[in-house]
Regions:
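Short glycine-/polar-rich loops that comprise or flank the Walker A/P-loop
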Residues: 34, 74, 95-98
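Acidic, low-complexity central loop/insert segments
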Residues: 90-199
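Glycine/acidic-rich beta-strand-loop module
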Residues: 62-92, 204-205, 217
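Phosphate-interacting basic helix/loop segments used at nucleotide- and nucleic-acid interfaces
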Residues: 184-194, 201-202, 384-390, 396
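Non-catalytic interaction surface on structured domains
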Residues: 191-292, 297-301, 312-313, 408
C-alpha cells in the first residue's frame, strides 16, 4: 500500500499537479472531467460567486467548494468538480492557516468590518488598563508610574490626557512605553487564553444551523441567537505587527498604514476618530475555528473590544496560496434596474484563466486525492471487487483513496472494515 501523509497535519508540502513532458505536435491539455481548482478568492464576492464562476468556466453544473470564506475575506478556496465534489467533506476538515488584522478598541455586531459599530472603548479604559498587571510578570510602581518588572518599561501617568488617550508633548501619539505594555499584554493573552485546545463560542453571524436555519439569518431577523461553545485547536497564533493610531468611528475596515510606508498612523485628523490598535496575526488552527471569534475574544480579554478588519486564508491542508496551480479571480460589478424600477448593483466573480490555461492549472482526480488523504494502490481485480461493493484485503487506518497505479484512475474511497480488510465508502464510475 502506498500512502502520503494526511494534509490536515499541516506539514505536507503544497499540492502541485504533476506536469507531463511536452510532446511535439500534441494537443493542448483538456480540462479533466473531475478534479480541483484552488482559487484565490478576491474581496467583495461570496464563496458561491466563485463556484458560479467555476461552473461557467468549466461548463458543468457539478461544482462545489470546501469551506466558506466571508465576502470580506480573501485567499484559498478549494473548488471541486465532477467526482471530486465527493472529496470536499474531507478537505473541509483539514487544518487551515490564516493571516488577519484584528482591530482592538472597537467592536461590531458581526465581529468584523461588515457589521455596525457597537462600541469604541479604548479612550475610557486607557488609564485603567495600564494599571492592570501584565500576565506573566509582576508589576510594581516606578518613579513615573506603573512598571512592568518583567519587561522593565515605564509609563508616565502625567502624559495621559483627560480623555484617556496618550500624547507626546508636541504631537498626538501613543507613548512608546505604552505601546510596549500593550504588545506584552497582547502576547500574554494570546499565549495563555487563545492558543492550544480551547473552547470557542462561534460568532452569532455564522453559517451554523439552528433547527434548520442559519444563525446569520436568525440574527438578521433580530432573534436571540445562542450558540454553544466548541472545542477547537489553535496550533499557532503569532503576532506579525502591532500598529497604534486613530480610526473614524463611522468608517470601518480600513487598516492603519504602517509608519514604514511613510504615512503616519498616530495623527488624529478627525474629531470623531478614536484610538485603536491594529494587530496583524498569523493563525494555524483546526477546522471549525472562527478567526472573527479569536479577534472578538482577544478584545474582550483586554477589556476594549475587538473585531476583524482583514482576513486571508493562505492554506487549507496541503493546498497553499503560493502554489503555481492557484487560480486568481477578480470582481466585476453589474449594474441593473429591478422590476420596481430601482437601480441596483451586484458583484460577480470572474476567473482570470480560461480554456487551456485553466486546464493546465486544474488538479486531476489523482492529484486531488493525493492532497486530501492517503493513497492505496490496488490491482485490476481489486477495482472490480470494489465496484461490486466487495471488500478488499488491505489493512488501512481511516479513509484512503484506492487507485490503479498504471492508469492513475481513482476507483473508490475506502475505509477500514476490520483488521486486514477495507470496504468501499464511495465508488466512482469506470
Amino acid at each position: 500500500m502506498g500512502t502520503v501523509p494526511e494534509a490536515s497535519g499541516g506539514e505536507q508540502a503544497p499540492i502541485v499537479a504533476a506536469e507531463a513532458a511536452p510532446v511535439a505536435g500534441s494537443a493542448a491539455p483538456a480540462t479533466p472531467t473531475s478534479g480541483l481548482l484552488v482559487v484565490d478568492k478576491p474581496r467583495g464576492v461570496t464563496s458561491h460567486d466563485i463556484v458560479a464562476a467555476a461552473r461557467g468556466a468549466l461548463h458543468m453544473k457539478k461544482v462545489g467548494h470546501a469551506g466558506t470564506l466571508d465576502p470580506m475575506a480573501t485567499g484559498v478556496l478549494v473548488v471541486g468538480f465532477g467526482n471530486a465534489t465527493r472529496l470536499l467533506n474531507h478537505i473541509v476538515e483539514h487544518d487551515k492557516t490564516y493571516e488577519a488584522t484584528i482591530r482592538l478598541g472597537q467592536s461590531t455586531t458581526t465581529d468584523d468590518a461588515d457589521g455596525e459599530l457597537l462600541s469604541a472603548t479604548l479612550p475610557e479604559r486607557w488609564q485603567e488598563l495600564l494599571a492592570l498587571p501584565v500576565a506573566g510578570g509582576p508589576q510594581s510602581a516606578g518613579e513615573n508610574g506603573p512598571v512592568n518588572a518583567a519587561k522593565g518599561s515605564a509609563v508616565s501617568a502625567a502624559k495621559v490626557a483627560d480623555d484617556g488617550s496618550a500624547y507626546h508633548p508636541h504631537q498626538e501619539a501613543f507613548l512608546p512605553d505604552c505601546q510596549q505594555l500593550w504588545r506584552d499584554r497582547i502576547d500574554d493573552i494570546i499565549a495563555l487564553q487563545l492558543t492550544g485546545s480551547i473552547e470557542q463560542v462561534p460568532n452569532t453571524f455564522s453559517a451554523i444551523k439552528i433547527n434548520g436555519q442559519r444563525a446569520y439569518d436568525l440574527a438578521r431577523d433580530g432573534k436571540d441567537v445562542q450558540l454553544k461553545a466548541r472545542r477547537i485547536t489553535v496550533s499557532a497564533f503569532g503576532v506579525l505587527d502591532v500598529r497604534f493610531g486613530y480610526a473614524p468611528t463611522r468608517q470601518l475596515g480600513l487598516p492603519l498604514v504602517s509608519a514604514a510606508d511613510g504615512l503616519a498612523t498616530t495623527e488624529r485628523d478627525d474629531a470623531e476618530a478614536t484610538p485603536v490598535i491594529d494587530v496583524d496575526v498569523r493563525v494555524s488552527c483546526s477546522a471549525g475555528t472562527y478567526i472573527r471569534a479569536l479577534g472578538r475574544d482577544l478584545g474582550a480579554a483586554l477589556g476594549v473590544g475587538g473585531h476583524l478588519i482583514r482576513l486571508r486564508r493562505t492554506r487549507v491542508g496541503g493546498f497553499d496560496v503560493s502554489s503555481p496551480n492557484v487560480i486568481t479571480a477578480h470582481v466585476e460589478t453589474r449594474e441593473y434596474t429591478d422590476r420596481n424600477g430601482n437601480h441596483q448593483s451586484r458583484n460577480r466573480a470572474v476567473l482570470d484563466v480560461i480554456g487551456d490555461e485553466l486546464a493546465g492549472k486544474a488538479l486531476t482526480m489523482l492529484d486531488a486525492v493525493r492532497g486530501t488523504m492517503p493513497l492505496l494502490a490496488i490491482t485490476d481485480q481489486d477495482a472490480v471487487n470494489l465496484r461490486y461493493g466487495r471488500r478488499i484485503p488491505y489493512d488501512i487506518h481511516g479513509t484512503a483513496a484506492a487507485y490503479l497505479p498504471q492508469s492513475g484512475e481513482v476507483v473508490a474511497l475506502v475505509e477500514r472494515a476490520k483488521r486486514g480488510e477495507a470496504k468501499p465508502a464511495t465508488v466512482f464510475g469506470a
